[in-house]
Amino acid sequence: MNLDLRIRTTCFVGICLGLALPCVAFAADTASELATKLRAKQSGSMFVRIRMEIGSGENQTIQIQIKSRVSDAAGDIVYQILFPKERKGESVLLHRSGHKFSGTVFTPPNNLKSIGSAEMKQSLFGSALSYEDIIDSPFAWSQQTIVGTEDMDGTPCQILESKPGKGHTSSYSSVKSWIDSRRLVPLRIEKYDSSGKVVRRINTTRVLLEGGDSLPVDLKVYGPGGSVTHITGSRLKRGVSYADSEFTPEGLKQLNAPPGSGS
């Protein structure tokens, strides 16, 4: 894969976690306008491959393909392990309808297990991310407020605080995003529990400019118990047409990539 393609495709790493944003802002946005722009970048249908390095000592590296179709009203996201060989085929389907979440875990050769709303905070493939981090975007929450400004490594950022409204169940009481106002890239996201303790922190460790857009190339996720996961993207195809069957428990048993994805 050439460098140009690799740079462009890494933007999905941020899209998955609410980090990949459009290009330079020309005027200050209100909190709700900013959240709307963030949410818009997560919408659409995509096929992606990423690499996860899990752990801070002897790292475990897994390669994953992601199929997604997301709108304001609903979302379906599938994560499937391609490597290492002993874990190939392990898959997770996550579904959102409004503010309700569900899912399915598939372990080869034929083990299917449902994920209930109470299990959304469980780890994705042993990483520092939870199922909830993947399927529930804080930028879709009803309460959005700009609570201050702060420099991140010399870069001025607006701090956007997101809180779930009534009827929205989340294990987080609030989420703060440090957004580079010039490039509209969140350089940090912190997720808090009800006591105000940081449960997860997501740092953008490298940003590149490509085609007028500033894209997060590398992310580092710090989770509960000192867990650490480094995520990089390697391939992206937008505007993919998926059959409904690909977002079903039975569809998890297939590792097929969409035509034209370069797989």
Briefly describe each language-model feature range:
Residues 122-124, 130-137, 151-248:
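Gly/Pro-enriched, hydrophobic low-complexity segments
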Residues 39-46, 209-213:
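Edge/loop elements at the starts and ends of beta-strands within beta-rich repeat scaffolds
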Residues 42-57, 77-78:
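A short, Trp-centered hydrophobic/proline-enriched beta-strand micro-motif
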Residues 50-55, 82, 161-165:
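Generic short beta-strand segments
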Residues 11-22:
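Bacterial N-terminal signal peptides
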Residues 1-7:
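N-terminal secretory signal peptides that target proteins for export/translocation
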Residues 28-43, 60, 86-88, 96-173, ...:
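Flexible, processing/modification-adjacent segments and terminal tails
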